[in-house]
Amino acid sequence: MNNVDELTLDLPNFTGPLDLLLHLIRSQKIDIYDIPIAKITGQYLANLARWQTLDLQIAGEYFVMASTLLRIKSQYLLPKNDFIEEDQYQEDPRTELVEQLVQYSVFQRIAEYFKKRDEEMPITVAKDPSVSPKKEIEPLPLGEITSDELANTFKVVLERFKLRKPQVGKIEVHETSIEEMTSFLKNRLQKKRSTSFFDCIKSFQDLDQVIGLFLAVLELCRDHKILVKQNRDFGDLELEKVEINGK
């Protein structure tokens, strides 16, 4: 059975080369941390070749990724250096690509989550605001973080977390994870009025938990139940419970 022939895909279905690669990996249940580079490269190039025969306009970034895959594949074909001792660390040629795929996967899942939330909004029953209109239109206090700064800080969180390999290669974000992390954060803020994002994730082992907590923070911010502050660029996030009527 020819795996390349089985995985012929349509170009318009993908937003870019990382999206295509993730599809190839997920559809075959491949561990994202142990990619069979020769197999995936062959399937990727086969799809590019097919798109070219169909006269489809292929963005240059797809060819850049093709050259990256071929470079990684060629590094595996090179003979091992006998002068390097066995216990001396040699970086896996796939490392940078894996990091890109993991980060892309995370933000893809977050985007999917917000798209789902937007689709649910029309059927949401409105309720009276839990804070006064005056409070809602007040400018952000000094130190309070904007959504762009929050996103940039989350990238730093991913960098910190990348050395902790998740227990599974297939990265998923489920609604239950977000609900669990919302409860986790509420309980933490019940004990003390403020905490920090980095402190919260110290004991986490899975990237799924980090993503779930990040989305829980956004949910609680949106509902005006917590404030998020940052004292320096890309620094820790201070999470503070909003007191309403002394509660």
From Swiss-Prot:
Q: Which GO terms describe its cellular component?
A: cytoplasm
| Superkingdom to which the source organism belongs | Bacteria
Instruction: Please name the Gene3D superfamilies in this protein's record.
Output: 6.10.250.2410, Structural maintenance of chromosome 1. Chain E
Q: Does the keyword Cell cycle apply?
A: yes
Q: What is its main location?
A: cytoplasm
What are the entry keywords?
Cell cycle, Cell division, Chromosome partition, Cytoplasm
Pfam families with a match to the protein in the record: SMC_ScpA
Report the record's Gene Ontology biological process terms.
Answer: cell division; chromosome segregation; DNA replication
UniProt-annotated location(s): Cytoplasm
Is Cell division given among the entry's keywords?
A: yes
InterPro entries documented for this protein: ScpA, ScpA-like_C
- Please describe the quaternary structure of this protein: Component of a cohesin-like complex composed of ScpA, ScpB and the Smc homodimer, in which ScpA and ScpB bind to the head domain of Smc. The presence of the three proteins is required for the association of the complex with DNA.
The protein's job, in short, is: Participates in chromosomal partition during cell division. May act via the formation of a condensin-like complex containing Smc and ScpB that pull DNA away from mid-cell into both cell halves.
Family as reported in the entry's similarity comment:
Belongs to the ScpA family.
| UniProt protein name | Segregation and condensation protein A
